[in-house]
């Protein structure tokens, strides 16, 4: 065996053999044939260890989520290791994370697998450990992460792009590399077969790695990485994407939370406010008591009706799409990582919010969702609900063009609409090209405003320079806001930790607020400090600029007249529509029903829409027995296959006193999706025998069929749910 890393192995040494394998896999028919090919490949490359031993992690690197720095040839010896070379700004790297999370759920370090994130920064701001910490928290990364700020391992292995996954054997030997996103099946196949291969040879160790999650040290906060903010100009309310808490907040001007929708955990569910869920939402837009949300990691556009207190999906199918054309009805059209939204008009004579513009970061494009039938520049008539590409080829570029489909964006992340003449355009914060661009609402032409470089393939032209046009330099801007009164554009220059202002007439770009340090200070514009601000919006008739100061977990308020910065004191309101509860407590999950639980079928009951049916528990304990004090005796409602029946219901409750048992009220929805349904009441009781010599957990399931009629029958008598344990 060669000394660890002695030969300076690189991915190029794997390329011929892995390329041959992947061609052979294309010709294989059955899964067994494919598995055998991978197994044979491993037999081949396993003998090349002297040439393909990776270099050790350099000493002195900063680590996250571990108790101490890790060594490939000590701590990781005996493990199959997946190295994820990533940079936290990159949307493609973000797209890989769900695959890694799924792999971690399937195989743990006890099984012999460990994932290590190797953070190799693109932008200077991303080399700073505190900023990587924020990203680790924001994206719920729970595996070890090393800050390879100088890209030492990247260069040693000749990694060429983000993301790149490198799979190592238990002796630090290179096995596979996967470049880019979209390789989930190969990742699972290669990893599982490698684990089996080395387990058969007795080379896998099941020892645990010392994991210390950074997120466990995070103090509670009303906001967690707020991404975007919008103002309801009719009422002055703020809408905040509380991204890290996976929820949307409606906040009064004084900071009191009026409504909290979703959270605290990620999910993908439509319905009433109390049951709906989001996954790292970003962009928000509000008009006429309706909020549109870029539900980024669900790859959806959601609609929040504040009057009906209901959430629905209006675009996307819930999985990442690769379509770069679109044209399907919204909820049938796959989309990819929408990052911001803006309400606007299709250009009809009547100015109305009939289009939702979408910054589609995942496909590097600008899309449109038709909220009413209309037309887009260079498009024929489009029907209501159509979700379609407006500008951008789908290639990650900084390419301007008079033809919108030939232009190229690089992870567009912020939108602002200037519908008035002479502008009539969308301003776009194009984060990976470090530019602000414009898209004409008249003909779709894409033009440069500030930042970046002339070469459309150069995505590394970033900096922090005030100037005009291409002489101005930004670093990964994420947000823009149009000031109609002053006719200027505000820019969240995120990785420079500044708010800048652009005059579109002169293309002049100057710093408005922020010292440039990643810090937190509320003072004058010149002395204030931000930490990766991600979104901003104009309020109070142009007097205030609200800023989502993402890594400071705050909404900052910039007074454009007094030129001061303050913090909005976000706090819970006693009259909030939904308790936001910082974060909201987890809803109870239904415990597993004991095998001994009785299942009782009840005779059908006839009910009508809108009726309240009373279900009364009548449970009897054995003689002398009593409920176990402090144990969670409880009931739950279930309606498998008919979940619509439980909307707006109280889904569970406690049983605290056997002599005063709860009555469960089942409100039949006014709009029923079926004329027959079954609701189950699941009961769990914890009780002790008379002499307290034994305590037990028992269960019973009552199954109540419902026959729903449109004619109003006589009021149904309460249903008794009787059972003796």
From Swiss-Prot:
Tissue expression: Ubiquitous.
Keyword Flavoprotein applies: no
PROSITE patterns: THIOREDOXIN_2
Chief site of localization: cytoplasm
CDD domains: NHL-2_like (cd14951), TlpA_like_DipZ_like (cd03012)
InterPro entries xref list: 6-blade_b-propeller_TolB-like, NHL2_NHL_rpt_dom, NHL_repeat, Thioredoxin-like_fold, Thioredoxin-like_sf, Thioredoxin_domain
Stretches the record annotates as Disordered: 319-338
Consequence of gene disruption: Full embryonic lethality. No homozygous embryos are present at 2.5 dpc.
Protein's cellular compartments: Cytoplasm, Cytosol
Keywords for this protein: Cytoplasm, Repeat
Coiled-coil stretches: none
GO CC terms in record: cytosol
Keyword Cytoplasm appears in the UniProt entry: yes
Residue span, Thioredoxin domain: 48-196
NHL repeat ranges, renumbered to this chain: 212-254, 265-307, 335-369, 409-439, 461-505, 517-561
Function: Required for normal embryonic development.
Quaternary structure and partners: Monomer.
Name by which UniProt lists this protein: NHL repeat-containing protein 2
Lineage: Eukaryota, Metazoa, Chordata, Craniata, Vertebrata
Gene: Nhlrc2
């Amino acid at each position: 065996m060669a000394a660890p890393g002695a030969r300076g192995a690189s991915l190029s040494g794997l390329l011929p053999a892995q390329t041959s394998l992947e061609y052979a896999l294309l010709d294989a028919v059955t899964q067994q044939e494919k598995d055998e090919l991978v197994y044979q490949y491993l037999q081949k490359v396993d003998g090349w260890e002297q040439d393909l031993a990776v270099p050790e992690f350099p000493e002195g690197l900063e680590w996250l989520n571990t108790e101490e720095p890790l060594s490939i040839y000590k701590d990781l010896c005996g493990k199959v290791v997946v190295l994820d070379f990533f940079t936290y700004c990159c949307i493609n790297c973000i797209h890989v994370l769900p695959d890694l999370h799924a792999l971690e759920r399937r195989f743990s370090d006890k099984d012999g697998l460990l994932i290590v994130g190797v953070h190799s920064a693109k932008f200077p701001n991303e080399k700073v450990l505190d900023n990587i910490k924020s990203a680790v928290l924001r994206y719920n990364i729970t595996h070890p992460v090393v800050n390879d700020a100088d890209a030492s391992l990247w260069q040693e292995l000749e990694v060429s792009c983000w993301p790149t996954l490198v799979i190592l054997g238990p002796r630090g030997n290179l096995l596979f590399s996967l470049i880019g996103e979209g390789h989930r099946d190969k990742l699972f196949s290669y990893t599982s077969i490698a684990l089996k291969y080395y387990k058969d040879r007795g080379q896998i160790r099941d020892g645990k790695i010392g994991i210390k999650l950074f997120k466990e040290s995070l103090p509670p906060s009303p906001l967690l990485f707020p991404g975007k903010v919008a103002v309801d100009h009719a009422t002055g309310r703020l809408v905040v994407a509380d991204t890290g808490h996976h929820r949307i907040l409606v906040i009064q001007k004084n900071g009191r939370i009026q409504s909290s929708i979703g959270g605290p955990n990620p999910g993908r569910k439509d319905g009433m406010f109390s049951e709906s869920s989001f996954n790292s939402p970003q962009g928000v837009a509000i008009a006429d008591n309706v909020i549109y949300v870029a539900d980024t990691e669900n790859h959806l556009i959601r609609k929040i009706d504040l009057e009906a207190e209901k959430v629905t999906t209006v675009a996307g199918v819930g999985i990442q799409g690769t379509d770069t054309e679109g044209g399907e009805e919204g909820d049938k059209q796959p989309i990819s990582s929408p990052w911001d939204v803006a309400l606007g008009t299709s250009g009809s004579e009547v100015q109305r919010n009939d289009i939702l513009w979408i910054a589609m970061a995942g496909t590097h494009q600008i899309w449109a969702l038709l909220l009413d039938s209309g037309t887009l520049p260079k498009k024929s008539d489009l029907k209501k609900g159509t979700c379609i590409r407006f500008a951008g080829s789908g290639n990650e570029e900084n390419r301007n063009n008079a033809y919108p489909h030939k232009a190229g964006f690089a992870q567009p992340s912020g939108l602002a609409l200037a519908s008035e003449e002479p502008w009539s355009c969308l301003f776009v914060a194009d984060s990976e090209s470090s530019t602000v661009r414009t898209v004409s609402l008249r003909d779709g032409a894409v033009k440069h405003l500030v930042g970046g470089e002339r070469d459309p393939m150069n995505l590394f032209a970033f900096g922090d320079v005030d100037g005009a046009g291409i002489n101005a330099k930004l670093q990964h801007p994420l947000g823009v806001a149009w000031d109609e009164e002053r006719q200027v554009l505000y820019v969240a220059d995120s990785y420079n930790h500044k708010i800048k202002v652009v005059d579109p007439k002169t293309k002049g770009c100057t710093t408005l607020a922020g010292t440039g340090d990643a810090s937190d200070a509320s003072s004058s514009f010149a002395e204030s400090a931000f930490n990766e601000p991600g979104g901003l919006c104009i309020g109070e008739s142009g007097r205030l600029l609200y800023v989502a100061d993402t890594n400071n977990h705050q909404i900052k308020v910039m007074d454009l007249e007094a030129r001061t910065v303050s913090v909005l004191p976000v706090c819970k309101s006693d009259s909030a529509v939904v308790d936001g509860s910082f974060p909201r407590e987890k809803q109870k999950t239904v415990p597993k029903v004991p095998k001994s639980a009785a299942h009782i079928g009840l005779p059908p009951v006839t009910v009508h829409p809108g009726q309240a049916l009373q279900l009364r528990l009548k449970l009897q304990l054995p003689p002398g027995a009593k409920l176990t004090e402090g144990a969670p005796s409880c009931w739950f409602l279930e309606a498998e296959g008919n979940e619509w029946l439980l909307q707006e219901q109280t889904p569970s409750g406690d049983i605290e006193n056997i002599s005063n048992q709860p009555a469960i009220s089942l409100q039949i929805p006014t709009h029923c999706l079926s004329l027959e349904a079954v609701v189950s009441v699941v009961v769990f009781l914890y009780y002790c025998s008379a002499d307290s010599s034994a305590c037990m957990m028992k269960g019973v399931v009552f199954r109540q069929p419902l026959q729903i009629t449109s004619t109003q029958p006589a009021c149904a008598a309460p249903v008794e749910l009787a059972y003796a344990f």
